[in-house]
């Protein structure tokens, strides 16, 4: 068994980004990305899950001027689900907190995926 540590804690993982539908530069990060409490994905659904992302996009006051479609203003940003996805066959490339890179398969046990997505949880896997 392996317990929590930097080599067993997920720091980041791949996400397939949507094309910029306005055809130009995406703009400053505050206008193009959505962050959920400092994270871009959560560990609830395994990699490449068929579950839909549930992300409400936060928009700056200039959204209409910059041609940013689909913006909604939301009060609660803490109940979002943003799944790690890739075009690799069978899984996603992920970086662990020790700097190592691992290929995590789509078949990872959901409990194990959730465990590596947290730090200091005391999980053993």
Residue ranges with predicted function:
Residues 1-125:
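Hydrophobic alpha-helical interface faces used for helix-helix packing
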């Amino acid at each position: 068994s392996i317990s929590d540590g930097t080599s067993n804690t997920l720091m980041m993982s791949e996400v397939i980004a949507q094309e910029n539908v306005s055809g130009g530069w995406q703009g400053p990060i505050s206008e193009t990305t959505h962050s959920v409490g400092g994270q871009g994905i959560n560990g609830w659904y395994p990699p490449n899950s068929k579950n839909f992302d549930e992300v409400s996009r936060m928009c700056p006051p200039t959204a209409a001027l910059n041609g940013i479609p689909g913006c909604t203003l939301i009060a609660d940003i803490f109940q979002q689900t943003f799944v790690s996805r890739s075009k690799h066959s069978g899984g996603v490339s992920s970086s662990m907190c020790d700097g190592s890179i691992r290929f995590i398969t789509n078949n990872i046990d959901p409990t194990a995926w959730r465990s590596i997505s947290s730090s200091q949880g005391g999980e053993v896997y």
